[in-house]
Design a protein with these regions (language model features):
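Conserved beta-strand-loop-alpha-helix hinge in the C-terminal portion
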Residues: 169-192
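ABC family nucleotide-binding domain
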Residues: 1-159, 165
Length: 192
């Protein structure tokens, strides 16, 4: 994921985001590209504790010097179900609510690609299901490209395509697999 997001540089091959080759892009230009084209959702939420939910959601736009589209942000907040929690700080929110803030923050800038690193890893099954539904809605309603890294077969089954990695290599590629197909492929990948 770090290679795809331009956080690390590949030793060979090319990486393109939004049609732009980022493989040898200078750091300043790469930072600007990430601000414009990439959203991140992490397992640990990475919300700033001194900011409210609303301030956390709008932070990437502020950093990028972009004015928020108030209607789009309001629709996003309604979609993630946080309208009544915008004035709350992260410590006043449940884990599921914090992850919904993180998803709204990542989507607020309308990125070309959303990277989700174990987005359900710290959540109970109900909150995890809600997060997967939000990511799925972003794909279906906004045509949002999403790359999710997970060890959870249930989470992976929400994807249109699942790649299996073992020892740094892609060892399997399944289109819209079931949870059972993923479990079989995971077992095969670990016993190669």
């Amino acid at each position: 994921m770090h290679l795809l997001a331009g956080l690390d540089r590949p030793t060979n091959g090319r990486v393109k985001i939004g049609g732009e080759d980022i493989t040898e892009m200078p750091d300043k230009q790469l930072t600007k590209l990430r601000r414009r084209h990439i959203g991140f959702v992490f397992q640990q939420f990475n919300l700033l504790p001194m900011l409210t939910a609303e301030e956390n959601i709008l932070l990437p736009l502020s950093i990028a010097g972009r004015k928020p589209d108030k209607a789009a942000v309001a629709a996003l907040i309604a979609r993630v179900g946080l309208g009544d929690r915008l004035g709350h700080k992260p410590s006043q929110l449940s884990g599921g609510q914090q992850q919904r803030v993180a998803i709204a923050r990542a989507l607020a800038s309308q990125p070309t690609v959303l990277f989700a690193d174990e987005p359900t890893g710290n959540l109970d099954s109900t909150s995890g299901t809600e997060v997967l539904q939000l990511l799925r809605e972003a794909v279906e309603l906004d045509r949002q490209t999403t790359v999710m890294v997970t060890h959870d077969p249930r989470a992976a089954a929400a994807a249109d395509r699942v790649l299996f990695l073992a020892d740094g290599e892609i060892v399997n590629d399944l289109a819209s697999p079931s949870e059972e197909q993923i479990l079989v492929a995971m077992k095969e990948a670990t016993h190669r």
